[in-house]
Amino acid sequence: MDVHAPTSAYTPSLASKRLIAAHGDREGATVGLMEVSEEAVQRYGIVAMDGDCIVDMVEKPSVSEAPSRLALCGRYVFPHNTKEALETCSYEEHGDLQSIALQKRWMDQGHLHGAVLDNTQWYDSGSPETWLQAQVDHALRRPDLGPAFAHWLEQRLNDYR
């Protein structure tokens, strides 16, 4: 997961299509999951599964507390009534509305499903450094921006050194 292919190896992702197909006509929500290394579990929300149902979530667990190596990767298919359901969640716990409270509610009801999205490039945008890396990679992969952006980036790096 932490190893990225060169930008020349880019092909469009089918992860969203795969997630929608996995969701089908289910009640509740389906979330994308990626398998991470044992050392990386402490950086993500990690889930336990029973078939395709998520039965437990642990936010940034230690290796010994992690129920698996399956991490929530920020791709979701939520039902049409999600906005109304979010309004019933408390602001107090996180200081704003977060979907994790709603996901836990669906999990408790047996309506939170997971789909492993292997063979997919995953960018973790949880830190400024990894967010910037994702932006640079995406810019370099775009035929309309990549060549000019690469030239500019090379000049900036030369100026920086």
Residue ranges and their predicted role:
Residues M1-D50, F78, L86-C89:
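Conserved beta-loop-beta/alpha segment of the NTase-like Rossmann-fold superfamily
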Residues I20, C53-H151:
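Catalytic-core segments of class I nucleotidyltransferases/pyrophosphorylases
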Residues P147-R161:
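Terminal low-complexity segments of carbohydrate-biosynthetic enzymes
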